[in-house]
Amino acid sequence: MSQPISPGLIRSTLRQFLDSEASGGLVLMAVALAAIVTANSPLAEGYFHALHIYLGPLSLLHWINDALMALFFLLVGLEIKREMLDGQLSSWSRRILPGAAALGGMLFPALFYILFNRENPAALRGWAIPTATDIAFALGVISLFGPRVPASLKIFLAALAIIDDLGAVVIIALFYTSDLNLLALAAAAAVLAALYGMNRARILKLWPYLLLGAVLWVLVFASGIHATLAGVLLALTIPLKATPGTREASHEQSPLHHLEHILQKPVAFIVVPIFGFANAGVSFSGVSAATLTEPLTLGVAAGLLLGKLVGVLSTVFLLVKIGLADLPAKASWGQMTGVAALCGIGFTMSLFIGLLAFNDPDVQDHVKMGILLGSLLSGLVGAAMLATFNRRS
């Protein structure tokens, strides 16, 4: 007769899962699949209706993408700052690599898209759609491999995706925003200056930063710029080290480490899964073979799958070979190729730009299919390459 499973064993197993590096990626993949199934089931109408219910000034979907995801960007920003000051990005040769790779990873996808749509001037308005990398999904996939992927590569991907998102924000502001609120933008700059001043004054309490951070989010949102940028900007002002000689002076007890520790589990198991479920639900109704072979669909898919891979990898190869940058520590070229492919997971920001670029629902369907196809293939290719070269190394 089999023995009953003890509650202690269940708690221990659950704790091991939550503490494993791959767990966040597994949860994200599961909820993304659940969203796709839901969006193509009898529950689809309720799913899409719920996302567009207005709660105050914003729909539920916008609260998730603009407010909740600011916490994700805050956490990623904290990690980037820590690595830049005291980690894998602490030298200029390592900082320049993700920056240049992000630029290459935006230029080549745009060129691929233009190549497919050069005969249709109206479609060229969507040139920026495949330039974006979805940082949450890309990091979710790479986290599936846990410690088998060097930490330096994960930091490289996070830094590249952050710069990529900042580039997407600039593109939206310059090419897809007609009513930028300069007054709100100026006020946001003033709040950011105050946060920087607090850092320079060595104010170590977290609550003043978080309070002004909330104000910064409101002002960035009001300016017309994607509000998640506020999370990154706030992170850059959080102190990494305490005042020398104080009890809090160790790295582990610095404000940045403390906030990073607070955010890690909620972001991995609440924020990102909610984001994934809200954004991954793409309906296949009305999709035909003709939809998949339209130049617009193919341009978006090729831009994400091929443009990102070629743009990121060729830029990294060039910089390393001419001696301007170093390959991330303990990483192989095979692993770098896999990470370059993961950069083609576009999803949220690509969808956002696509909806801004085109108002026609039929055209939007083509855009969504291109994003889904390109992102899915990029994720599969990147994961396959990482799995292959992780075994070899």
UniProtKB/Swiss-Prot annotation:
> Gene3D superfamilies, from UniProt?
Na+/H+ antiporter like domain
> In its keyword annotation, does this UniProt entry include Amino-acid biosynthesis?
no
The organism's superkingdom is given as Bacteria
What GO molecular-function term can you cite, just one?
A: sodium:proton antiporter activity
> Which InterPro entries does UniProt cross-reference here?
Na/H_antiporter_dom_sf, NhaA
Q: Which reaction does it catalyse?
A: Na(+)(in) + 2 H(+)(out) = Na(+)(out) + 2 H(+)(in)
- Locate the transmembrane regions by residue number: 24-44, 58-78, 96-116, 126-146, 155-175, 178-198, 214-234, 267-287, 300-320, 338-358, 369-389
Q: Which GO terms describe its cellular component?
A: plasma membrane
Supply the PANTHER family for this chain. Answer: NA(+)_H(+) ANTIPORTER NHAA, SODIUM ION/PROTON ANTIPORTER NHAA-RELATED
Q: Which family does it belong to?
A: Belongs to the NhaA Na(+)/H(+) (TC 2.A.33) antiporter family.
What job does the chain carry out?
A: Na(+)/H(+) antiporter that extrudes sodium in exchange for external protons.
**NCBIfam families named among the record's database cross-references:** NhaA (TIGR00773), PRK09560.1 (NF007111), PRK09561.1 (NF007112)
Output this protein's name. Answer: Na(+)/H(+) antiporter NhaA
Species per Swiss-Prot/TrEMBL record: Rhizobium etli (strain ATCC 51251 / DSM 11541 / JCM 21823 / NBRC 15573 / CFN 42)
The major lineage groups are: Bacteria, Pseudomonadati, Pseudomonadota, Alphaproteobacteria, Hyphomicrobiales
**What gene codes for this chain?**
nhaA
